[in-house]
Amino acid sequence: GTVDDIDDDFEDVLGEMSPENRTITIRLLQIFEEIIEEKQTEEAEVLKIYKQIELDNVPDAIDRVNWQGSAVDVAGQIMSTLILKHALPNANHRTSISMAQWYLESLQTGFSFPEFATADYEWKEWVDEYIVESKRILTVRRNTRAFLMLSEWGCDIVKRKDDIDIELSEYNLDLSTSEAFKYYGDIHTELCTEFVKETVKRAGYDELLGIDGVEKSDFVSYLQAEE
């Protein structure tokens, strides 16, 4: 699996996208492929993973971003919408964080993210706190009605995969499915924006907290120039 292979596999889907969305989507795929290669995934597993990619979800995620905000707000939105749309079968958080990094780097301030992972490819503790809470929010967002019922039956904690506990009393569960998607989507975006802000501070680029972001067209031009 190479980037060329990916482009061939998804040629029809990519062809239906706007030029700007196509450029961003191709970069997302390149980031994803690099992550898969870093993990030295077996070839058979790689092919299986590629077949599970829901590429047509990416433009919808991109179109939900308000490109008029501050740099950290836009980066947080990019990260959040890509995670929420879950276009990739795995590595959604790593890939979405990397895309937010590309966006902040497009401001050309010299900014680069601090290291997020340890040598054995585990999240550093401060990063893991955000990732775990993100996964909790994603799970609650999809299951408010079921979790409300469990809570009424006396259940206090739900355990999801990755051994993550969800304390039901900490979340508003009395929401319809559509209300939950909007409510927890907004909370997830706030979480991702806080993550981006902490990242910028840890990297020593506090000035990024107070500057406007770049327009979508400028971001796309940056990606094209870096190809």
Feature annotation, model-predicted:
Residues 1-227:
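FIC/Doc superfamily catalytic core
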